[in-house]
A protein has these predicted regions:
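Aromatic- and glycine-rich beta-strand/loop motifs that create alpha-glucan
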Residues: 1-8, 20-31
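Acidic/aromatic-lined carbohydrate-recognition and catalytic surfaces
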Residues: 4-12, 33-224
């Protein structure tokens, strides 16, 4: 065991391994021949791993690609324009994804995760780790536009009005269906309420849930 004294500031470290003239390094990337300090291990003083997480079987879920439990909340083709193209609803889950796949949506949602809780428990899963679930125009949702609400495309769409974009139209001020879906308070509050029940069901089963919080940056669609 190695004892590393810590103060109040985070510290970073890596291992340097020497065998004769051969030098390599061990860090978050594994063993490398080149030193890359940005991938050093880190220690945050005062942080304590909760006991329930130690040794727990965790299952990470990229929600859009897991299971479609509610087709009524699927992102629609031409619902809005994002980065390099219009949003696209993908029907064939077995097709090879596009290289630029960020605006392709397969319809996976939180209802799909709920529907598969028995399956996950049968696998021995104790903790579900969800990739970001808050309002965002991408399928990965690391570019959040509203931290206060679960994205209705993952939750509940109870109010659904407005037009889709024409094939030639890249102006999202015309994306009335998208705007209604992700800003209408009925949809936002219904999605949050559904998520609360979802978490209760997970806890009732003796399982835990971890959310991926992305707080060091937001997306270009942000509400601020």
């Amino acid at each position: 065991a190695i004892q590393i004294p810590v103060g109040s500031e985070p510290i970073h470290y890596y291992f340097e391994i020497r065998a004769g003239k051969i030098v390599c390094y061990y860090n978050e990337l594994g063993v490398t021949r080149q030193l890359q300090e940005q991938y050093s291990f880190g220690i945050i003083p005062g942080f304590h791993t909760p006991d329930w997480a130690k040794g727990a079987v965790m299952y990470q879920i990229f929600v859009d690609r897991f299971y479609n439990g509610d087709s009524s909340n699927d992102v629609l083709t031409n619902e809005y324009f994002y980065i390099s193209g219009h949003s696209r609803r993908i029907e064939d889950w077995s097709k090879i994804p596009d290289n630029m796949d960020v605006n392709n949506f397969y319809g996976g949602d939180l209802q799909g995760v709920m529907d598969k809780l028995d399956y996950l428990q049968d696998l021995g899963v104790e903790v579900i780790y969800l990739n970001p679930i808050f309002v965002s125009p991408s399928n990965h949702k690391y570019d959040i536009q509203d931290y206060d609400y679960v994205d209705p495309h993952f939750g509940k769409i109870v109010h659904d009005e407005g037009n889709l974009l024409a094939d030639w139209d890249k102006d999202n001020t015309h994306a009335k269906r998208y705007i209604d879906r992700v800003t209408n308070k009925e949809n936002l509050e219904a999605s949050n309420a559904w998520f609360i029940d979802f978490v209760k069901e997970i806890h009732k089963r003796g399982m835990r849930i971890i959310l991926d919080g992305v707080f060091n940056h937001c997306g270009s669609f942000h509400k601020w």
